[in-house]
Amino acid sequence: MVFGIPASAAELDGRRERGEAMLNRITADEGRMVVESLSDISPELGDWIIEFAYGDVFSDTELSLCTRELATVSALTALGNARPQLKVHIDGALNVGCSPDAIVAVIIQMAVYSGFPSALNGVSAAREVFADRGVGVTTANSRTGER
């Protein structure tokens, strides 16, 4: 049963298979480690991450994976209290082809909606991920073109 709706084992198997493949594609080992870390306290939460978040939502093809990851980075930045998840999804955005500049741009956009502290914290998280990955951003001011 998924959200109170009876589901066949084949449907659940398909969701899990899709979810595991998508989780691996976006987050590589980090996502798997998060799910595994839940096995001793809340394995069902790990199942929901795989089957719902990645098997249903992230596997939907209406948005590109880059767009989906940028939306996720925006939301996690705006929350302001999800730094570990934000770093995983910044890394995931890079994994699916988002540019570092686009990632920073959506984080900066959140200053308007969730405040400068959340945007500053988001930029700090991005800086760490970029340093770990050895990637940089274009430092030009997009309004003036100055470097």
Language-model features and meaning:
Residues 64, 82-104, 117-129:
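Extended intrinsically disordered, low-complexity coil regions enriched in Ser, Thr, Gly, Ala
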Residues 22, 53, 88-89, 106:
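A general alpha-helix detector
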Residues 3-66, 95, 120-147:
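Acidic, glycine/proline-rich low-complexity segments that act as flexible tails and inter-domain linkers
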Residues 77-78, 96, 109-116:
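A short structural micro-motif
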Residues 104, 108, 140-142:
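Alpha-helical transmembrane segments and their immediate juxtamembrane flanks
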Residues 68-76, 86, 106-107:
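Short, structured motif recognition centered on aromatic/hydrophobic residues
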Residues 47-50, 80-86:
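Short acidic alpha-helix initiation/capping motifs at coil-to-helix transition points
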